[in-house]
């Protein structure tokens, strides 16, 4: 099947094109709504690139240029020849708990729950509507970041607030990075030559946004992110878990509005708030130069991660493997080492030489004596979206 995967942002469209699950092209429409917009399409098979620089006023114009570049490159004759298009959607809310084909109800529901993800869902919706207009005969599939976590039990996803907040306003823990956690847990099963239903995995997706997921027999039973992606780990610019009583205190102390506090927690906190950097390469360079705030930021990040992984050892009946993924999880050997050393009493023994090797691809980095496998698996959310899109179109 020919599947296009779209990740639509407020001023951008990222895309990948798969033919029978093999990536053929990838690209980006950036600076939508600006005069210096750019469209880039790369033929993955021969590294040939096709670019246009022009004014792109909206998503519809951007996708039209993408279609032109597909034709020019010879990769795809027309968007209408696709078998399907998979759309990454951050938040499905309470009612859209599973990936699904797009229809009028789905469009209305994605719009309705935009209040939960105001920076993401409206842009995703624009991407879907643009695709429907550009290629009306092509099936569109909505792939929700929240869907993988639909298997969490109620005692894991509920907040201890008055029940009406859940019943009437759908306030609960939803979890995110679901497509990534689903992908790497499946790959872990393949690497360990086991069926997903036989395996318990703790997946750590570590990027500028970061989350941990406890996966029992292929199903999410708990995850660190909650109602929004702000809960949980210390992240690049997000604070993660916080005593909620701090918020009214800060408001009175600094005279900040709710919106300003939201910006503070999401964009000015995390390791950036501690040391002024959110790129871990910069943080580790600063540590080498004696920057104690950088050292503190790294220690806080790793300590919170250790606490969550340790908690999920308690949640799962048995832990077979820990998976590191995301930009930091895949590339930062120091973070992996600091985390695994603190978890040694749980049967985790890292092979330090394997951990330090700067190689790409899936690999096992635990010592042969380790009771728990430690894996590094590069995530591929677009491939997972393409796979699910094919599966749902095939069923219908």
Swiss-Prot record:
Substrate binds at residue 88. Its cofactor is Mg(2+); Mn(2+). Mg(2+). Can also accept Mn(2+). The record marks 177, 238 as: Transition state stabilizer. It catalyses: acetate + ATP = acetyl phosphate + ADP. Its main location: cytoplasm. One of its GO terms (molecular function) is acetate kinase activity. One of its GO terms (cellular component) is cytoplasm. GO terms for biological process: acetate metabolic process; acetyl-CoA biosynthetic process. Keywords: ATP-binding, Cytoplasm, Kinase, Magnesium, Metal-binding, Nucleotide-binding, Transferase. It is an enzyme of class 2 (transferase). It is found in: Cytoplasm. The keyword ATP-binding applies. Disulfide bonds: none annotated. Its EC number is 2.7.2.1. Pathway: Metabolic intermediate biosynthesis; acetyl-CoA biosynthesis; acetyl-CoA from acetate: step 1/2. Mg(2+) binds at residues 7, 381. ATP binds at residues 14, 205-209, 279-281, 327-331. The active site is at 145 (proton donor/acceptor). Catalyzes the formation of acetyl phosphate from acetate and ATP. Can also catalyze the reverse reaction. Belongs to the acetokinase family. Homodimer. This is Acetate kinase.
């Amino acid at each position: 099947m020919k599947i296009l995967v779209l990740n639509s942002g407020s001023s951008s469209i990222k895309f990948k094109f798969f033919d029978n699950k093999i990536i053929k092209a990838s690209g980006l429409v950036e600076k939508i709504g600006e005069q210096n917009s750019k469209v880039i399409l790369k033929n993955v098979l021969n590294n040939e690139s096709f670019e246009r620089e022009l004014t792109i006023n909206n998503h519809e114009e951007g996708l039209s240029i993408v279609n032109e570049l597909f034709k020019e490159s010879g990769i795809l004759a027309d968007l209408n020849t696709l078998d399907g298009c998979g759309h990454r959607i951050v938040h499905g809310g309470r009612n859209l708990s599973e990936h699904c084909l797009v229809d009028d109800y789905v469009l209305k529901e994605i719009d309705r729950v935009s209040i939960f993800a105001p920076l993401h869902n409206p842009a995703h919706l624009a991407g879907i509507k643009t695709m429907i207009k550009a290629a009306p005969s092509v099936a569109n599939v909505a792939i929700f970041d929240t869907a993988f976590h639909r298997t969490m039990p109620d005692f894991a996803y509920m907040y201890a607030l008055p029940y009406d907040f859940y019943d009437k306003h759908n306030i609960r823990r939803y979890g995110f990075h679901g497509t990534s956690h689903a992908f790497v847990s499946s790959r872990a099963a393949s690497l360990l030559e086991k069926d997903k239903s036989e395996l318990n995995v703790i997946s750590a997706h570590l990027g500028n946004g970061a989350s941990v997921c406890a996966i029992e027999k292929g199903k999410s039973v708990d995850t660190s992110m909650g109602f929004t992606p702000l809960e949980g780990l210390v992240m690049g610019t997000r604070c993660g878990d916080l005593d909620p009583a701090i918020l009214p205190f800060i408001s009175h102390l600094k005279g900040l509005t709710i919106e300003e506090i939201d910006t503070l927690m999401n964009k000015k906190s995390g390791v950036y708030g501690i040391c002024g950097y959110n790129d871990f390469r910069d943080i580790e360079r600063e540590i080498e130069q004696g920057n104690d705030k950088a050292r503190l930021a790294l220690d806080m990040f790793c300590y919170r991660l250790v606490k969550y992984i340790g908690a999920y050892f308690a949640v799962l009946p048995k832990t077979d493997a820990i998976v590191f993924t995301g930009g930091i999880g895949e590339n930062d050997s120091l973070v992996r080492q600091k985390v695994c050393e603190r978890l040694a009493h749980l049967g985790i023994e890292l092979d330090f030489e394997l951990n330090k090797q700067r190689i790409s691809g899936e690999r096992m980095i635990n010592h042969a004596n380790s009771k728990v496998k430690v894996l590094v698996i590069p995530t591929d959310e677009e491939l997972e979206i393409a796979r699910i899109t094919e599966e749902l179109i095939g069923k219908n």
